[in-house]
């Protein structure tokens, strides 16, 4: 799957994916997210609340977002593992307000009010959902 195909799948709605992070001790967390957007072939942005994922990303900027689209059989499933590294993490300013406004439009004011920070990631690697 090339990056354009990954971007099409990544940005399809509705879809949910998981974001895996680890703190500086290597303790792993995985959480379900609907807000991440792949804005080009090298960049993912998202809004986040004040939670374990946010704390982990402050300590360790690396993460993996897994996106999956079910098929008729497991062999028909589409998906990718998108390896990420934090570039910007902002709790105010234009980027933050832009992300928050996008979440308000997509999920409502209540969801937007829960956003504590906006994150910009660079994509460091893309791998298939399953490797044989």
Tell where the protein language model's regions lie, with residue ranges.
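Binding-site signature for planar aromatic cofactors or substrates
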Residues: 1-132
């Amino acid at each position: 799957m090339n990056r354009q195909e990954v971007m099409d799948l990544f940005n399809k709605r509705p879809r949910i994916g998981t974001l895996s992070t680890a703190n500086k001790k290597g303790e792993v967390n995985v959480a379900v997210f609907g807000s991440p957007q792949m804005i080009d072939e090298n960049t993912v942005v998202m809004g986040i609340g004040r939670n374990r994922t946010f704390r982990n990303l402050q300590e360790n900027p690396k993460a993996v977002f897994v996106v999956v689209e079910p098929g008729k059989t497991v062999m028909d499933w589409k998906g990718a593992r998108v390896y990420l590294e934090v570039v910007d993490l902002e709790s105010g300013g234009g980027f933050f307000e832009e992300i928050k406004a996008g979440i308000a439009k997509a999920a409502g004011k209540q969801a937007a009010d829960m956003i504590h920070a906006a994150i910009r990631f660079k994509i460091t690697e893309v791998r298939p959902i399953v490797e044989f």
